[in-house]
């Protein structure tokens, strides 16, 4: 297990534990000891990914392991979320460590021995499921941190709340989920969280390197759908139709000018992107469809721009 990443995760609790060379050596030894287990967890989660609000298997493995460590465990938080509470032997702050658990509706095309072959349904369509964003690693890493900190319970000043979040990529369309629902259901209370930390792996960052910056580090994402209603006709008689596919194409092109011609780059955090993920129509190949639905994903660091 990469010690730099482990120390980052443990650092929030090292503020509550005497920061001595002996303690750091103990943590390093513990990290080495559980490296194989963390890798095994990660590969298992990678092979068995689950979509947002459906992380039943993953949540079960997490909850059972936290219970085996003697933690107070709450399940079903924000639908499939898991929360573990570790109370140190000494008084101190409440620190939350958070990892996400959900996979993505993506077909895995890798030669890995533990590649996902999972199929599921997403927004009414049959899809492959893959941990394409590293949440398998996040979950396994936080389980490892829970084990290390549990072994330091007698030296711990304060409480650590381990939050395993579902639906970080967003819940299915029309459903609640993710961090917002967990907060609504009280995940930051009982006990009240004084400070919370999370991280995200990044394949573009060299191994052993941690990157950070003031303010937002990763952009938010929004889910938007546009329904274009036309008039259906046979493809041989396009003049009898109002073709929503052609209209959708013009909308998609025009959306690019939202950023290039309407964004004030002198404002704070001007970074903003708009990506068109899918265009869906239910017509056969010889019909001009009636409804057509482009799916749009704006990304930003500034809610005012959104």
Predicted regions and their residues:
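Short glycine-enriched loops at secondary-structure junctions
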Residues: 100-103, 110, 221, 276-280
């Amino acid at each position: 297990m990469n010690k730099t990443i482990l120390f980052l995760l443990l650092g929030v609790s090292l503020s509550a534990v005497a920061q001595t060379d002996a303690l750091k050596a103990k943590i390093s030894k513990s990290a080495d000891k559980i490296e194989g287990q963390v890798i095994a967890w990660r590969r298992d989660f990678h092979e068995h990914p689950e979509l947002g609000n459906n992380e039943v298997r993953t949540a079960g493995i997490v909850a059972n392991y936290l219970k085996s460590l003697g933690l107070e465990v709450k399940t079903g938080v924000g639908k499939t979320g898991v929360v573990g509470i570790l109370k140190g032997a000494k008084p101190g702050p409440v620190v939350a460590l958070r990892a996400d658990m959900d996979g993505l509706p993506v077909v895995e095309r890798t030669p890995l021995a533990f590649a996902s072959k999972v199929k599921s349904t997403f927004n009414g369509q049959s899809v492959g499921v893959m941990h394409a964003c590293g949440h398998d690693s996040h979950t396994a890493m936080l389980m490892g941190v829970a084990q290390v900190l549990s072994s330091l319970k007698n030296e711990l000043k304060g409480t650590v709340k381990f939050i395993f979040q579902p639906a970080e990529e967003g819940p299915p369309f029309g459903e609640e989920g993710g961090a917002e629902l967990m907060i609504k259901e009280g995940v930051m209370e009982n006990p009240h969280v004084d400070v919370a930390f999370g991280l995200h792996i990044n394949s573009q960052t060299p191994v052993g390197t941690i990157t950070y910056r003031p303010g937002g580090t990763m952009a938010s994402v929004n889910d938007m759908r546009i329904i274009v209603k036309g008039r259906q006709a046979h493809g041989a008689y396009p003049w009898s139709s109002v073709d929503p596919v052609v209209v959708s194409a013009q909308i998609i092109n025009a959306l690019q000018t939202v950023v290039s011609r309407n964004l004030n780059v002198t404002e704070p955090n001007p970074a903003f992107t708009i990506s068109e993920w899918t265009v869906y129509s239910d017509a056969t190949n010889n019909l001009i469809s009636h409804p057509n639905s482009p799916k749009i994903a704006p990304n930003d660091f500034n809610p005012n721009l959104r």
